[in-house]
């Protein structure tokens, strides 16, 4: 059997063994995709014992390509929500998550200096302790750029594997410990979250308001600032028994009922100006109006602002809200449409059908992947990651590398959405498939390279010490920030658990947090709020630590 055939066969075996290990769960918690790393270690141990020789060049290419695929698809997935998460609505959660990253970096630096841990080893421990595989790839990349011997770089994967299991368990232990310390009643926390509905970011809500302000009588909607802006959408108006879709020229009268869509604070301001909230239903049922969800798939409208399409004037149809990559947004007139946007339309059936034709609404297009933008994005990302930035006093030029470059490029392209007929939207199923393929390839190679000396390091070497160092890097930031968030910010416990899981980019921890109260969306919401920024920081941090430690000796 040729070297290439043998290498591919071994990688396939690693994937099978690793995915099987990852699917084994104890009390609902498992290693998940991280099991591939341990599958690689097991197979790598026996490959080393058997004296087999695998193609090192091929393994290196597969490892790097897997990493590129993984970080690129993550960037495309979270790009639309990344910049939104930095706005005021998610600022508090992101600040706490950033604090976790900073404290983790400080603990790593202190351990490195106190115990004289080799640079590749401490970076591997850091990456494993925070359960972040792209951080491992980024760290290995910068070490190679700094001229570190390959046998030392491979130690990073081994120390990563030592710290990884407690990284998974440590966050679960932290959630449990904080619950005990603060005597949390999960049901009460869920009810509090449901009553406020503002944790992690302002949600889109709807209210019905009766016009009671005499100053608004006989004014057109376009002349009422709170209704003519981009923060509140008036999607329905009911006068006596008639329900209609209002246009900017529609004149409102005392006693009219308005159905408004917006964020809670903006709706409260509208209520102060217009009148009292009422329980009267403004449902389209039994009327000549209907509500429909339409998907943007027509290339001719990509990048166009909602106001430029004149749906209100031409079709008497109102866009009440917009869903982009799972994030609900107020459909302000200045928003530019992107491929895959889901719009809530209110209007007559024939008018909605006409608007749907303009927007595309071709569901089959959502299942198709444009491969040209994928490779354009990857190519641009690799180029971006290869650009050197020279900093005086540093031994090597800083680069984003094969982990940071594709990630940042994907975040930008995901936010832009489309350029002409090229759109970077990727169906969730395709994105997940490419992402899982990438991480399986990457972890398989890392595990294989680490497997030969893993048992010896664990039993006769410093493996147990590495596990202890990793436990500190995992636990100290989580416990510190958890206590601060609860005591100082009075953060909801379920929201805090989601934030902690997001700060470790740890899906098993999110699953655990969701199971604390299955019907509450608090944990998932805060996880999604901090995930994009934290993923970016987790990839950049090992590179900064590596250059810092290298420069100060």
UniProtKB/Swiss-Prot annotation:
Pfam families: Asp-Al_Ex, TrkA_C. Residues 191-276, 279-361 form the RCK C-terminal domain. GO terms for molecular function: monoatomic cation transmembrane transporter activity. The keyword Transport applies. Keywords: Cell membrane, Membrane, Repeat, Transmembrane, Transmembrane helix, Transport. GO terms for cellular component: plasma membrane. The keyword Transcription regulation does not apply. This is Putative transport protein YidE. It is found in: Cell membrane. It comes from the Bacteria. PANTHER family: K(+)_H(+) ANTIPORTER SUBUNIT KHTT (PTHR30445), TRANSPORT PROTEIN YIDE-RELATED (PTHR30445:SF3). It is a multi-pass membrane protein. The chain crosses the membrane at residues 4-24, 28-48, 65-85, 95-115, 158-178, 371-391, 393-413, 439-459, 464-484, 493-513, 533-553. Belongs to the AAE transporter (TC 2.A.81) family. YidE subfamily. GO terms for biological process: potassium ion transport. The gene is yidE.
């Amino acid at each position: 059997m040729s070297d290439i055939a043998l290498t591919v066969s071994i990688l396939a075996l690693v994937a099978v063994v690793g995915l099987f290990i990852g699917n084994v769960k104890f009390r609902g918690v498992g290693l998940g995709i991280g099991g591939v790393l341990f599958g690689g270690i097991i197979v790598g141990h026996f490959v080393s014992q058997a004296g087999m020789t695998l193609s090192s060049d091929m393994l290196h290419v597969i490892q790097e390509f897997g990493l590129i695929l993984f970080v690129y698809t993550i960037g495309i997935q979270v790009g639309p929500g990344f910049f939104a998460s930095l706005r005021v609505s998610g600022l508090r959660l992101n600040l706490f998550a950033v604090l976790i990253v900073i404290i983790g970096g400080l603990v790593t630096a202190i351990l490195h200096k106190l115990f004289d841990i080799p640079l590749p080893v401490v970076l591997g421990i850091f990456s494993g302790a925070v359960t972040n595989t792209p951080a491992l790839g980024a760290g290995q990349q910068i070490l190679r750029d700094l001229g570190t011997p390959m046998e030392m770089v491979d130690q990073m994967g081994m120390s990563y594997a030592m710290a990884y299991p407690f990284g998974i368990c440590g966050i679960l232990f932290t959630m449990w410990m904080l619950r005990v310390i603060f005597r949390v009643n999960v049901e009460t926390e869920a009810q509090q979250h449901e009553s406020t509905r503002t944790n992690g970011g302002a949600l889109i809500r709807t209210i019905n308001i009766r016009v009671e302000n005499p100053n608004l009588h006989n004014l057109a909607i376009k002349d009422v600032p709170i209704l003519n802006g981009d923060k509140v959408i008036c999607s329905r108006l009911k006068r006596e028994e008639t329900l209609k879709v209002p246009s900017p020229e529609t004149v409102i009268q005392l006693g009219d009922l308005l159905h408004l869509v917006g964020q809670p604070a903006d709706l409260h301001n509208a209520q102060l100006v217009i009148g009292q909230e009422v329980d009267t239903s403004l449902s389209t049922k039994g009327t000549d109006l209907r509500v429909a969800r339409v998907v943007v798939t027509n290339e001719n409208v990509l990048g166009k602002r909602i106001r430029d399409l004149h749906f209100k004037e031409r079709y008497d149809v109102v866009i009440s809200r917009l869903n982009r990559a799972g994030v609900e947004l107020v459909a302000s007139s200045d928003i530019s449409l992107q491929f895959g946007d889901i719009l809530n339309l209110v209007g007559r059936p024939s008018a909605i059908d006409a608007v749907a034709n303009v927007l595309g609404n071709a569901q089959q297009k959502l299942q198709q992947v444009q491969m040209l933008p994928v490779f354009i994005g990857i190519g641009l990302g690799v180029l971006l990651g290869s650009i050197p930035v020279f900093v005086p006093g540093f031994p090597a030029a800083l680069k984003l590398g094969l982990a940071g470059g594709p990630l940042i490029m994907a975040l930008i392209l995901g936010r832009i959405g489309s350029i002409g007929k090229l759109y970077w939207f990727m169906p969730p199923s395709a994105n997940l498939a490419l992402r899982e393929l990438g991480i399986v390839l990457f972890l398989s190679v890392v595990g294989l390279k680490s497997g030969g000396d893993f048992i010896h390091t664990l039993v006769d070497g410093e493996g147990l010490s590495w596990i202890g160092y990793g436990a500190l890097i995992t636990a100290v930031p989580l416990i510190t920030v958890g206590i601060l968030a609860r005591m100082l910010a009075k953060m909801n416990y379920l929201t805090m658990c989601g934030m902690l899981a997001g700060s470790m980019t740890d899906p098993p921890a999110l699953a655990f947090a969701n199971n604390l109260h299955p019907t509450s969306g608090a944990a998932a919401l805060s996880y999604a709020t901090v995930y994009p920024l934290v993923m970016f920081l987790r990839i950049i941090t090992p590179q900064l630590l590596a250059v810092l430690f290298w420069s100060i000796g």
